Amino acid sequence: MREDKIKATKHSPSTLERIGMRPEYTITVYTENQIGLLNRIAIIFSRRKINVDSLNTSPTEVESVHRFTIVINETEDVVRKLCRQIEKQVDVLKAFYNTEDEIVWQEMALYKVPTDEIAEKVKVERLLREYGARAVVIRKDYTVFETTGHREETDGLIKALEPYGMIEFVRSARIAIIKDSSGFHDKLKTYESSAPGDELVENEFLNKQEEVFTM
């Protein structure tokens, strides 16, 4: 885990910006499930030379609506402008950004370690229990363990297993839920209620096309 990220968990975003550091933000984007949208969103970040630390896509509680969960380290001003730019994309319904304190989030990690090391060393088994790891595949030559938690927790288990010949490691992107959100279903109903209705409205300019559109 990088030192700047360790510090980012101990100070508020405004404090980090004052000392010249970029705080971590989680951007949640609600979209329609359309081909090519991921590429268009990625271009927004690449054009601004902003590195994406984590990216996850998944369905939501609303049928046909998907969500992107994007983690970056940037100033709030930059993140706010990014969300506005993302919302201009066709098929994007809404974009939100939150600090770590405003979300509930987790990451999953898989660890492949030699089975002999686990069987012969009680300390390894104790380590795995401490981190809440569970076996998902057990073979003669290796065992795969899975654990879920925050970045510092999954990183901690990596360092703990390295002396025992860890073969492979992989971590998922972040998944997150906004604490104060009532869900996108309620937001969608609000948008629908404010959408244009079928009622005809008289417009005084409709019958004056030549006057209105002539310079």
Question: Which role fits each region the language model picked out?
Answer:
Residues 2-66, 71-215:
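Long, contiguous binding/interaction regions
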